[in-house]
Amino acid sequence: MVLYFLWTIYDFDRPRRGSRGWSWYKNHPIWKHFADYFPLRVVKTADLPPDRNYIIGSHPHGVLSIGAFTAMITSGSGFPDLFPGLKSTILTLNGQFWFPFRRDIGIALGGVESSRESLQYLLENPGKGRAIAIVLGGATEALDAHPGRHNLTLSSRRGFCRYALKYGADLVPMYNFGENDVYETIPNPRGSRTREFQEWIRNIWGICPPLMMGRGIFNYSIGILPHRRPITSVVGAPIRVNRVENPTQQQIDELHNEYCKALVDLFETHKNLHDIPKDVHLNIY
């Protein structure tokens, strides 16, 4: 344990400096079995040439972001086969790297911490073909993870557009249909006391997992395992972004509007994959 502790200190900055993904672990058969449990799959709508860098906005957060995790840092749902030549990763909560051994699993999969420093490192590092997924709604959006609902926290999230402009990284919307369906969660409408309490916890700790219920190993109604319900990660067409070293607020806002429109179009075009009624639409807050 002493040697492990010393190694952790020496390697402390690894999650914010590109991590250290191991191909054999990312491609291990266990991830295919994991994907088959739900099942999970990726749908490609356009090519992502490896001569560009990409910031992939993943929606919705859900309870655990299972679709984004499986697509971006494992081979389980087929992302590497559909987009050859890309080096994919995902920005995840810094706390994922605070716990012994769990930290090493995250690093081995190539996950990086969600911070300005880590995103800048990835985009400034020489070479192209990086596909960096960010679950843009974060902990706030996780509180809206209810089956059959499609509520996103995105209106005020514009930093990703600024970085896309600054480094000339194309934006790609990705919607994980079914992400909100794998757990049942308690009602917590905006403005309710339950929601206010959850937001109070989130403001103190940075996270507040939704109060949820899944299934057990030997039953289908009570437990912490996710329900076996399909998740389909639809990867949209890239929005070409030209590099602007010092983008203006107007440029950021215009790119944000273009991204939101592309995301809504992606949802409307592919919602039939999960039999979502025609009168159900994406709500962006």
Regions found by a protein language model. Give the residues of each.
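N-terminal membrane-anchoring alpha-helices
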Residues: 1-32
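Alpha-helical protein-protein interaction elements
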Residues: 2, 16, 22-23, 152, ...
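Soluble catalytic domains of membrane acyltransferases
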Residues: 26-234, 238-239, 245-247
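Eukaryotic basic, amphipathic alpha-helical target segments in cytosolic regions
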Residues: 42, 168, 243, 263, ...
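Structured cytosolic regulatory/catalytic domains appended to multi-pass membrane proteins
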Residues: 130-131, 138-141, 256, 260, ...
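Pol beta-like nucleotidyltransferase catalytic core
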Residues: 231-234, 250-267, 273
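C-terminal helix/juxtamembrane-tail motif
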Residues: 271-285
